[in-house]
Structures are given as C-alpha cells and as structure tokens.
Amino acid sequence: MVRNIMAKEFSRTRRIAQQLQQELAQVLQRDMKDPRIGFVTVNDVDVSRDLSYAKVFVTFFEEDKAVVQEKLNALISAAPYIRTLVAGRMKLRVMPELRFIYDSSLVEGMRMSNLVSQVINQDKAKQQQFGSEDASVEDEVLGDDVADDADETEGKD
C-alpha cells in the first residue's frame, strides 16, 4: 500500500512538472516583455515532492557567458512575476517557488556535434587528397601496363 501511494506521488509530481514546463514555456514566449531575457528554452522542470519549489532548467542560445548570466539574472529577478502568471494558468493549491538554473547541456551538445562534423569533414578532405594522389601514383607505377591489359581484354571479346 505504501509503495502504491509513493508511486502515485511521484507520478503526480512528474505530471505537475510536465505541465509546469509547458506553461512556463508559453509564459516566457508570449507574456514576458523583458528584452533582457530574449529567446529562452525551458529544457526541464524538477518539482520537489512537497511542491514547495521547482528547479527550472533553461537554455539561451548565447555563447558569451556574461550575456547568459545577465539573461539568467533577469529571469531570477522576474521569477515571482512569472510564478504569478503561471499560477493563474494552473489549478494548484500551492504554486512552487521557481528557481531558474542555466542548463548548458544543449549548447554543449551542439558544440560537440559541430566538432565531430568538423573532424569528419577534415577526414573526408584528407581521404580525397590522399586518395587522388594514390590514384596518380598507381597510374605512374603501372603506367601503360593497365592500358595494355585493357586493350588485350577488348580484343578477346
């Protein structure tokens, strides 16, 4: 019985976290007029079991750490206002306190993907460069023997 109650609590907090993530994304996109925040993505929301607070993981598509910190500070200062807006959209007795946390995993993943793509392109360029040189070396080494073999094969048909 205790196990079943705990499972329900966790599924409830998970459902609340998902709904909170959707509502936060809409509020930040449509209702926030603060130019300091700009374009923000809500990656994940982790709600405490007692619903007293929610960690909101956000990403900005900025690489400059000073700009990212400025945007995060703007979100943190606007957290009570954002909480009020979201509370009006959700049917909760207690609205969690919002704690915004910068999530660098998406930006870091994109950076790693770009690095992998660059290495692959460099390898392809080296293969083409050395591949064409290898072909010209083969032609020089084999010389006319290849052409003679081709002529002999044509005559047998």
Curated annotation (Swiss-Prot):
GO MF: ribosomal small subunit binding
UniProt KW Hydrolase keyword: no
Region (Disordered): 127-157
UniProt family annotation: Belongs to the RbfA family.
Name the record gives this protein: Ribosome-binding factor A
Subunit structure: Monomer. Binds 30S ribosomal subunits, but not 50S ribosomal subunits or 70S ribosomes.
Reported function: One of several proteins that assist in the late maturation steps of the functional core of the 30S ribosomal subunit. Associates with free 30S ribosomal subunits (but not with 30S subunits that are part of 70S ribosomes or polysomes). Required for efficient processing of 16S rRNA. May interact with the 5'-terminal helix region of 16S rRNA.
GO biological process, one term: maturation of SSU-rRNA
Cytoplasm listed as a keyword: yes
GO cellular component: cytosol
Swiss-Prot/TrEMBL keywords: Cytoplasm, Ribosome biogenesis
Organism: Shewanella baltica (strain OS155 / ATCC BAA-1091)
